[in-house]
Structure formats: C-alpha cells, structure tokens
Amino acid sequence: MGLSDGEWQLVLNVWGKVEADIPGHGQEVLIRLFKGHPETLEKFDKFKHLKSEDEMKASEDLKKHGATVLTALGGILKKKGHHEAEIKPLAQSHATKHKIPVKYLEFISECIIQVLQSKHPGDFGADAQGAMNKALELFRKDMASNYKELGFQG
C-alpha cells in the first residue's frame, strides 16, 4: 500500500502547483464535491444555504474552508505516509464533531483528482494520477483506522 520514493515525488510535484493557489483549488474541490454529491453539503451548516454554483463561487467562507482542507491535506502528503501525528486530531474532529463518513472522504478524493486533471493536465499524467490515488487511499485508510479506534463507524 505504501508509495515508492518516486511516487511520493510525483505527488509532491503536483502538490506544489496546488500550493500556488490553495484557495482557488480548495474552492473548486468543494464546489465539485457539493455539486457531485449534494448530500455532503448537509454536513456543513455554514454552506447549506448555498444552492447554486454561482453562490458557491461568491462565498468567501467556502473559499477559506477549501484552503483549510487542502492546507491540512498538503501537510499530510508532505509526511510521505508518516502522518500519524497529523491524522489523529483530524480523525478525532471528523469522527466525533463533524461525523464525516469515510465515503465522503472518497468523494472529496475523487474531486481532488478531477481538479488536478483539469487545472494541471501537463503535470498530472497517468503516473502522477496513480501516485496521488495511492496517497489519498493511504490517507483514507488511516482515517478509517482512527475512526474505528474512536468507535465511529462512518
């Protein structure tokens, strides 16, 4: 399940592109998530009222939250699988406070891949996509493992 050094390098190379515009990437990821999986919007009291894509694009709060999500994920990816210290508090809040099911983590992972394909096609070929999929799968597996320890069957 682990990634090779080369795979981590592919992940971090494309992540460097994300970091050039974290709020823009984060906003696009969340809009794709909410449009593609409207049920996920119910977990976000702050965004439930946003019904159209235009309303979502105009929301500074959504942009800020997108930046928060991708900043946290970037911190995890940079640990190259040695991310237990970063995962534990994230799993704790997502299991006990926000009650975000693992399925929703799968949904947002798909959206991240789609945004990277759309925004960075030249830097996100098949090898990079495969590596990012593996990195996001590792993240989800470790979140799920922590959820289980916390007694959350999300």
From Swiss-Prot:
Keywords: Cytoplasm, Disease variant, Heme, Iron, Metal-binding, Muscle protein, Oxidoreductase, Oxygen transport, Phosphoprotein, Transport
Domain Globin: 2-148
Alphabetical list of InterPro entries matching this protein: Globin, Globin-like_sf, Myoglobin
Compartments where found: Cytoplasm, Sarcoplasm
Residues that, per the record, bind O2: 65
Modified residues (Phosphothreonine): 68
Keyword Transferase: no
Entries under Pfam families matching the protein: Globin (PF00042)
Location of Phosphoserine modifications: 4
Role summary: Monomeric heme protein which primary function is to store oxygen and facilitate its diffusion within muscle tissues. Reversibly binds oxygen through a pentacoordinated heme iron and enables its timely and efficient release as needed during periods of heightened demand. Depending on the oxidative conditions of tissues and cells, and in addition to its ability to bind oxygen, it also has a nitrite reductase activity whereby it regulates the production of bioactive nitric oxide.
Protein's UniProt name: Myoglobin
Species annotation: Homo sapiens
Gene name of the encoded protein: MB
